[in-house]
UniProtKB/Swiss-Prot annotation:
GO terms for molecular function: phosphoric diester hydrolase activity. The lineage of its organism: Bacteria, Bacillati, Actinomycetota, Actinomycetes, Mycobacteriales. InterPro entries: GP_PDE_dom (IPR030395), PLC-like_Pdiesterase_TIM-brl (IPR017946). The keyword Ribonucleoprotein does not apply. The keyword Iron does not apply. GO terms for biological process: lipid metabolic process. It comes from the Bacteria. Keywords: Signal. Residues 1-25 form the signal peptide. PROSITE patterns: GP_PDE. This is Uncharacterized protein MT2337. It holds the Pfam family GDPD. Gene3D superfamilies: Phosphatidylinositol (PI) phosphodiesterase. Residues 34-303 form the GP-PDE domain.
Length: 304
C-alpha cells in the first residue's frame, strides 16, 4: 500500500529515501537487543498463522508472536489473514461464512511455497487453521502476543477476542493492533484489552517529525506503536499549474523519532518489515524496542 503526502518541503522527504546500506559499519550499541517478533508466526518459513509456524518460531527463539485474527460464523476467533479463504487454503469465501468446524477442515498450508523449491510441500501434510485459543496454548506463558485484527464489522471480532483472552488469562500479555481505525476504536472501548496506537496516528507523528520536527500528535503513554523500517511513499507537491510527484523509500524511524515517541513514559515502538541483519542493526542503533520479521529462522542468526 502506498501513502500520498501533500507537501511543499519535498527535499526533506527525499533526504530520508534509500535503502539502508550501512549495517556492516553499525555498532550494536550498549542497549538491549530489540525483541524479535514473528510476523504471522513466521510467514516465510512455514504456513502462516498455524500451530506449526508458532512452534517453530518459538524453537527459533523469538521474543514475541504476531498473529492475524478473524472470527468464524459461530463467533470463534481463528488465525487467518486474507479476506478470501482461497488465497491460502483449499477452501473459498470469507472466514465469517464458515463455522469453526468447517474452517478447521481446511488446509492453511495449501498454497504455501518455499523460496527456491518447486511445488506445494504442505498439500500432503495438512496444517489446519487454528483457533486463537489453540494458538495461545502453543506459546510460552510469558511470551508477548500481538493480535492483528483483520475483519469488519469490528464488534463481533473484538468481543470474541476479548472473551478468549479473559478465559485463557492471556489479556495481560496481549496487544491488540489493527490497520483499520474502526477496529482500533472498538478495541479501545472494550474492557480488558491492551490496544496499540492507531496506525493513522503513528504515521502522522512520524511524518510530522520528518518534515517539520514537531512531535505531534502527542504520544500516548503505555501504548505500542509500529511502522515499517523502510516504506515506499509518494510525495506530491501542488503548484498553480499542476503538481510534482516523487517516489521515495522513506526511513521514518530514526533516533529523533524514537525519542519523540518515548517522550511520554512507557510508550514502546516496533519496526515492521525487518528483513536483514542490516535492518536489525539499524533498529538496534536507533533504539527500537522490537522488530517484526517474516523469517525467525534467519533472524535467530542476527544476534550473534
Amino acid at each position: 500500500m502506498v501513502k500520498t503526502a501533500m507537501l511543499g518541503a519535498v527535499a526533506l522527504v527525499i533526504a530520508l529515501g534509500g535503502t539502508c546500506g550501512v549495517a556492516d559499519a553499525l555498532p550494536l550499541g550498549q542497549t538491549d537487543d530489540p525483541m524479535i517478533v514473528a510476523h504471522r508466526a513466521g510467514t516465510r518459513d512455514f504456513p502462516e498463522n498455524t500451530v506449526l509456524a508458532i512452534t517453530n518460531a518459538v524453537a527459533a527463539g523469538v521474543d514475541g508472536m504476531w498473529l492475524t485474527v478473524q472470527v468464524s460464523s459461530d463467533g470463534v476467533p481463528v488465525l487467518y489473514r486474507p479476506s478470501d479463504l482461497a488465497t491460502l487454503t483449499d477452501g473459498a469465501g470469507p472466514v465469517n461464512s464458515k463455522t469453526v468446524q468447517q474452517l478447521q477442515q481446511l488446509n492453511a498450508g495449501w498454497n504455501f511455497t518455499t523460496p527456491g523449491v518447486e511445488g506445494h510441500p504442505y498439500r500432503q501434510r495438512a496444517t489446519p487453521i487454528p483457533t486463537l485459543e489453540q494458538a495461545i496454548g502453543a506459546t510460552p506463558p510469558d511470551m508477548t502476543l500481538f493480535l492483528d485484527l483483520k475483519q469488519t464489522p469490528p464488534q463481533p471480532l473484538v468481543s470474541a477476542v476479548a472473551q478468549v483472552l479473559t478465559r485463557t488469562g492471556a489479556a495481560g500479555r496481549s496487544i491488540v493492533y489493527s490497520t483499520n481505525a474502526d477496529i482500533t476504536a472498538a478495541a479501545s472501548r472494550q474492557e480488558g484489552l491492551q490496544v496499540a496506537e492507531s496506525r493513522d496516528v503513528t504515521r502522522q507523528r512520524l511524518f510530522n517529525m520528518a518534515l517539520n520536527h514537531h512531535c505531534d500528535p502527542q504520544p500516548d503513554p503505555g501504548k505500542w506503536a509500529g511502522f515499517e523500517l523502510h516504506r515506499d511513499v509518494t510525495v506530491t507537491e501542488e503548484f498553480t499549474l499542476g503538481s510534482g510527484i516523487s517516489a521515495v523509500n522513506a526511513e521514518l524511524w530514526d533516533e529523533a523519532s524514537v525519542d519523540c515517541f518515548r517522550s511520554q513514559s512507557g510508550m514502546k515502538v516496533m519496526g515492521f518489515a525487518v528483513k536483514t541483519v542490516d535492518d536489525y542493526r539499524l533498529a538496534h542503533k536507533i533504539g527500537l524496542d522490537a522488530v517484526l520479521v517474516d523469517s525467525p529462522l534467519a533472524a535467530q542468526q542476527w544476534r550473534h
